[in-house]
From Swiss-Prot:
This is Regulatory solute carrier protein family 1 member 1. The tripeptides QCP and QSP mediate post-transcriptional down-regulation of SLC5A1 at the trans-Golgi network. They inhibit a monosaccharide-dependent exocytotic pathway of SLC5A1. PANTHER family: DNA DAMAGE INDUCIBLE 1 HOMOLOG 2, SODIUM-GLUCOSE COTRANSPORTER REGULATORY PROTEIN -RELATED. GO terms for molecular function: sodium channel inhibitor activity. Residues 410-412 are annotated as: Involved in post-transcriptional down-regulation of SLC5A1. It comes from Homo sapiens.
Length: 617
């Protein structure tokens, strides 16, 4: 159906007589109103008025051109316009426009109404764009802006008669009767929703309904009424230019006037919430909202709204289907190309236990090649939350660089014919009463020990000089820690003897935050050395053997430190050592455990037994 834009901002479909589906039923009047709304942004408030004035000027020019074309039939139209004397008082008699002064008056009135309408539109959109855009308030402004000016109704009526000379006007008394019937029907409908309105608002709305009916008749809104006694139709809609084709609000109403539609839909539908907070993408700019509401008379109210660019291009319009008045009727359903969808993205993260298992498996697999490539290597793995770890390949390369120096500069008292690989895995033990933790030596595997240890103190100065010059122990850790104890041999730092329990408890707490540390300890050829690796900036706990010099160590990002400190050997009773040996442990393990616990044989034996406990992961 073709529609022609008019100067009042509405597009009225041109219908011929007899086209209405509700012939002979004045209560079932059907009319279609199309509103053209300009896309308004907060920064474009100064552009509203020029666009509206331009559109209405083009409208006036189009009407004047139509008047000139139909100038020959003005005399015939004046005869038909004489029947409008019986119309209500707000409809003036139709007078044909024949001179240029009346044309100027029409243009002036149109511009005046355009200014008023743009002011109202500007005020409304600026007050509603940040909070909630109410459908009711939006529609309430439209009849007031476009239909409230009574001074140009006669001109519009005359222009409509000029634009379509072949259609005749319905007698005024029938129009008045229809208006009275619709006014009474609207009053009854307003009584249904009167609990939300004040009596003053009802009276005002009733007057607006009557004025709207008369105004729509004067403006030429198509009301196809074909009673049995009259076979005439209302003049068709007037023609006016509309420069904006971006946004259309099409409102198809049945059995309701425009103001009644505003009141009913404004209370049946909740306001459009958070217009400025949501996103309306330009890819899907159109959204149709079809509301099917039923009043107590089972009358259908179809509201099809197609909106585009009412807000800035990054707003998403969401209309909740809240039905306050008629909860048992159908709620508005959202349809079209811009139906909003709620997407809930739930991020699933693996549990800490699963992550630790994976990390432990990776560390075990990656530590196997390194233990075979080195002649004397100690790998201490702290099974805790770990991310930053040093590659074992790099550790092996560091070891091989110093390996030939070790073999060439061994002391004559000690000789290793075969490589010794010590793999120490430190874990946190939470179920032991001594709180020693699994950072104690768990697995000590000696492949082959040659001649053993030498306790000859005469060779100590010579070996220490050569060691300090040419060799260093590479202790590589991914993250520095205060105390990570790897007991690998006979001697332990006497610092642990003073506060053994405090040190072990601190170690248990600190290993929780350690990353997987790979510590590569290079034996200097004097026997199995003991090392307690700490942060080099804070403290240095160096653990040599009973008669051996200290070990030099370097973190992965620093040079080998050269601050030796010789610790005196500790002597333990032979009975305690024999007791531990009879339990199935080696001499080195017995001496290391005794040094660790300060000579307490019972506690040393308990530590050695606890390291064999396997905690399921």
């Amino acid at each position: 159906m073709s529609s022609l834009p008019t100067s009042d901002g509405f597009n009225h479909p041109a219908r011929s007589s007899g086209q209405s589906p509700d012939v002979g039923n004045p209560m079932s009047l059907a009319r279609s109103v199309s509103a053209s709304v300009c896309p308004i942004k907060p920064s474009d408030s100064d552009r509203i008025e020029p666009k509206a004035v331009k559109a209405l000027k083009a409208s006036a020019e189009f009407q004047l051109n139509s008047e000139k074309k139909e100038h020959l039939s003005l005399q015939d139209l004046s005869d038909h316009a004489s029947s409008a004397d019986h119309a209500p008082t707000d409809q003036s008699p139709a007078m044909p426009m024949q001179n240029s002064s009346e044309e100027i008056t029409v243009a002036g009135n149109l511009e005046k109404s355009a200014e008023r309408s743009t002011q109202g539109l500007k005020f409304h959109l600026h007050t509603r764009q940040e909070a909630s855009l109410s459908v009711t308030s939006t529609r309430m402004h439209e009849p007031q802006m476009f239909l409230g000016e009574k001074d140009w109704h006669p001109e519009n009526q005359n222009l409509s008669q000029v634009s379509d000379p072949q259609q005749h006007e319905e007698p005024g008394n029938e129009q008045y009767e229809v208006a009275q019937q619709k006014a009474s029907h609207d009053q009854e409908y307003l009584c249904n929703i009167g609990d939300l309105e004040l009596p003053e608002e009802r009276q005002q709305n009733q007057h607006k309904i009557v004025d709207l009916e008369a105004t729509m008749k004067g403006n030429g809104l198509p009301q196809n009424v074909d009673p049995p006694s009259a076979k005439k139709s209302i003049p068709s809609s007037e023609c006016s230019g509309c420069s904006n084709s971006e946004t259309f609000m099409e409102i198809d109403t049945a059995q309701q006037s425009l103001v009644t539609l505003l009141n009913s839909t404004g209370r049946q539908n909740a306001n459009v919430k958070n217009i400025g907070a949501l996103d309306l993408t330009l890819d899907n700019p159109l959204m149709e909202v079809e509301t099917s509401k039923c009043n107590p008379s089972s009358e259908i109210l179809n509201d099809s709204i197609s909106t585009q660019d009412l807000q800035p291009p990054e707003t998403n319009v969401e209309i909740p289907g809240t039905n306050k008045e008629y909860g048992h009727y159908s709620s508005p359903s959202l349809c079209g190309s811009c139906q909003p969808s709620v997407e809930s993205a739930e991020e699933s993260c693996p549990s800490i236990t699963a992550a630790l298992k994976e990390l432990h498996e990776l560390l075990v697999v990656s530590s196997k090649p390194a233990s075979e490539n080195t002649s004397e290597e100690v790998i201490c793995q702290s099974e805790t939350i770990a991310e930053g770890q040093t590659s074992i390949k790099d550790l092996s390369e560091r070891w091989t660089q110093n390996e030939h120096l070790t073999q060439n500069e061994q002391c004559p008292q000690v000789s290793f014919h075969q490589a010794i690989s010590v793999s120490v895995e430190t874990e946190k033990l939470t179920g032991t009463s001594s709180d020693t933790g699994r950072e104690a030596v768990e697995n000590v595997n000696f492949r082959s020990l040659g001649d053993g240890l030498s306790t000859d103190k005469e060779g100590v100065p010579k070996s220490r000089e050569s060691i300090n010059k040419n060799r260093s122990v590479t202790v590589t850790s991914a993250k520095t820690s205060n105390q990570l104890h790897c007991t690998l041999g006979v001697e332990i730092s006497p610092k642990l003897l003073a506060g053994e329990e405090d040190a072990l408890n601190q170690t248990s707490e600190q290993t929780k935050s350690l990353s997987s540390n790979f510590i590569l300890v290079k034996d200097l050829g004097q026997g199995i050395q003991n090392s307690v690796t700490d942060r080099p900036e804070t403290r240095e706990n160096v653990c040599p053997d009973a008669s051996r010099p200290l070990l030099e160590y370097e973190p992965p990002t620093s040079h080998p430190s050269s601050s030796p400190a010789i610790l005196p050997p500790l002597i333990f009773p032979a009975t305690d050592i024999d007791r531990i040996l009879r339990a199935g442990f080696t001499l080195q393990e017995a001496l290391g455990a005794l040094h660790r616990v300060g000579g307490n044989a019972d506690l040393a034996l308990l530590v050695l037994l606890a390291k064999n406990i396997v905690v399921p992961t």
